[in-house]
Amino acid sequence: MAGRFGTGRRFGIEGGIIGVATAAVASLAVVGAFVLLQPSAEADTVNQARKPAQPPRTAPVDPTIVHASDRPGRSLNITIDDGPDPVWTPKVLQVLKDNGVKATFCMIGPQAAAHPALVKKVVADGHRLCDHTVNHNTAMDHRPDDYQFRQILEAKKMIEDAAGGAKVEYYRAPGGAFTPYSRKLAADHGMRPLGWNVDSKDFEGGSVATIESTVRGELQNGPTVLFHDGGGNRARTVEALERLLPWMKQQGYGFGFPQR
């Protein structure tokens, strides 16, 4: 006790008793505090355990619009928009399979939700998924951020739910109507903004020969080629793909996916 309160002679026996009593009271206070705190700490642990687990955030990707292929050398990216369609998507899938080509399917959310078996078939065949919004509004770039938010993320959920959990890896704005906000939003949710270099113009109603000629003439523009499997009668698209894919191989092209 001398070390804490001075000399033992100053306090004598009384000082010793007081010191012991003080120490005992202090010890009881510590024990009491520990006992009182224990239930609260346990309750906090239980409450934390009861909180729903937060889903892991998808790793963000580059927000710039990609055109390049992930395959080195002379390579093309085949992209298919506006489906899935119960008539034309299976036919497009068959042509791709016959030619050993993988593609990226840019799907409209409600179409994916309406045809989940087709979405799963696309994934099972080794193709990749792309978000093409809920309503395919080509004036997206003139709409407010909250509208773009719903269009992009609601479609993403519809497609992934239909796919059984497969990830949507790209976002293509309808008509190319990207904004800085939509590109960053998509990228923050793991979807690389996806452009195109070659527009087959198959949606304009031209002949198969016109589609072929357009694609052949524009391949020098870059590797990402745009076709459609939804939004109308795509018989000409299917036939054009049947002709173009073997021709592309004869020209020495390989096939990859857009870079992530």
Give the label of every model feature segment.
Residues 93-104, 128, 145-176, 184-187, ...:
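CE4/NodB-like, metal-dependent polysaccharide N-deacetylase domain
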Residues 79, 104-108, 130-132, 172-174, ...:
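A cross-family glycoside hydrolase active-site/sugar-binding cleft signature
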Residues 109-112, 135-138, 174-177, 199-202, ...:
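Short histidine/acidic/glycine/proline-rich micro-motifs that form metal-
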Residues 50-143, 147, 151-158, 168:
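Active-site beta->alpha N-cap acidic-glycine motif
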Residues 205-256:
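Signal peptide-directed secreted proteins
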